[in-house]
């Protein structure tokens, strides 16, 4: 009976899920990936649907567990890495209220320029 960790790489184009056996060395036991949509708009918008992230995580979790004989009770760790600088707006219950803004979204370039030019001035930073 070994010890295992499950890891999730939640990227821009999809999620990659792996189960690793932990010991003197770390051994890949099972892996699966699944893509999801990136909605790109003519005005520079780039958005993603958070529910698609969750659905892909659930699906790949089932796939990696189905492909190996690891007992879920032997999974002693979980690891996440993900895309950065996205924005998910949520309500008071933590539910997303719209698609997430991707870090690739370019719709606020004018606001960014104004913020840098007229926002708080930090010595040496701007």
PLM regions and their residue ranges:
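Short glycine-rich, Thr/Ser-proximal phosphate-binding strand/loop in the N-terminal lobe
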Residues: 5, 10-50, 95-103
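Glycine-rich phosphate-binding/catalytic subdomain of phosphoryl-transfer
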Residues: 42-45, 59-126
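Nucleotide-sugar donor-binding/catalytic module of glycosyltransferases
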Residues: 53
């Amino acid at each position: 009976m070994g010890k295992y960790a499950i890891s999730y790489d939640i990227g821009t184009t999809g999620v990659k899920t792996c189960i690793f056996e932990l010991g003197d060395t770390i051994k890949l036991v099972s892996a699966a990936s699944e893509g999801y949509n990136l909605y790109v708009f003519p005005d520079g918008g780039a958005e993603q649907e958070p529910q698609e992230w969750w659905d892909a995580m659930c699906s790949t979790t089932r796939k990696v567990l189905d492909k190996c004989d690891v007992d879920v009770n032997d999974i002693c760790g979980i690891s996440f890495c993900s895309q950065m600088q996205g924005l998910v707006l949520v309500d008071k219950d933590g539910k997303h209220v719209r698609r997430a803004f991707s870090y690739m979204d370019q719709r606020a370039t004018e606001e960014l320029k104004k913020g840098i030019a007229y926002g708080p001035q930090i010595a040496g930073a701007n």
